[in-house]
Each structure stands twice: as structure tokens, then as C-alpha cells.
């Protein structure tokens, strides 16, 4: 892709800004705003898998370095899931966003906060109903397992969700559900 050399340069500069110890934290916080995060997460719908991988790396670094932007990242990811579920029904980066979310879930402290539980129930569990489920089933299953590992009581809403979205008549998807 001829554009990739330019895009990779932009992402390298952004990564440098995020990681640099020479740039004051206040400046980073000012420019990497909630709106910036929303636009960054929207880029995960890129048709280029290489760009999505770069975005994943940048998002991980922002999440780790700018703790005050963590909630904005989680909100933007959830909003992307909502848009995918209830509006567009198409998104190229759901599996990559689930990979990011898995590392975020892994860092959750106990007890699980109500906002994280709501994310599970309102955006993650409904992802099972989508026709594209097979494209991201491994990553979604891993997120479900991490939630249960953190709090066993969350297995009940997950099982109820699987039963609610059971893919009757789609044997391939049924097998994926059983494996989960």
C-alpha cells in the first residue's frame, strides 16, 4: 500500500509523543483528549490490517501511559460495539478491539465495578448475536473467560446471554457457542 509509508510515519510520531519523557504530561493530556480518543478508536474500521495492528499498539500505550484517558478509551470501544450492534452491523476491527479489551479486563480490580459489568451485559454479550460472530469468536470468548475468572458470579449473565442468542439452525455457530 503506497499510503502506508505516510501512515506509519504518523503513527510512529504519535507513539513517540505518547512515550516520550521529554513531553510534559499536561501537554499530552491536552492534545490526547476524549475527542481524540473517539476518533482514534473509529480508525479501527480501517480496511488495512497493518493499520489496525499499529492502532492497537498505540491504544495500548495510551491506556498504559495516560491513566486519565482510560475511561474514554473504554467508552469509545463500547460505543463502537453499540454502533456495530444497533446501527451499522459492519466493522472491520471488532476482533482487534476485543484483543485490546481483553488486556483491559485482565487489569480490572476486584470487585468488578458496575460500569464494567454493564459493559459486559450491554455490549459484549450481545456481540454473540451478530452474523459476523465467527470472525471474532475467539477474542470474544477470551473476554468472557476473563470476566468469569475475575468474578465467577458473572457466569450466570453470560450463560443467559448465550442462551438468548443461541444460533438455532447454524451448526457452525452452535459449535462455537458450545466451545465458549
Predicted regions mapped to residue ranges:
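Amphipathic alpha-helical elements of HEAT/ARM-like alpha-solenoid repeat scaffolds that form extended
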Residues: 6-18, 53-60, 91-106, 134-148, ...
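Histidine (H) residue identity feature
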Residues: 6, 16, 30, 39, ...
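Internal metal/ion-chelating core segments
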Residues: 56-118
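Short coil/turn segments at helix-helix junctions and helix-capping linkers
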Residues: 1-5, 39-51, 68, 83-92, ...
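Asp-box/WD-like beta-propeller blade repeats and closely related beta-sheet repeat scaffolds
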Residues: 25-48, 56-62, 80-84
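Eukaryotic helix-linker segments that join adjacent hydrophobic helices
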Residues: 1-42
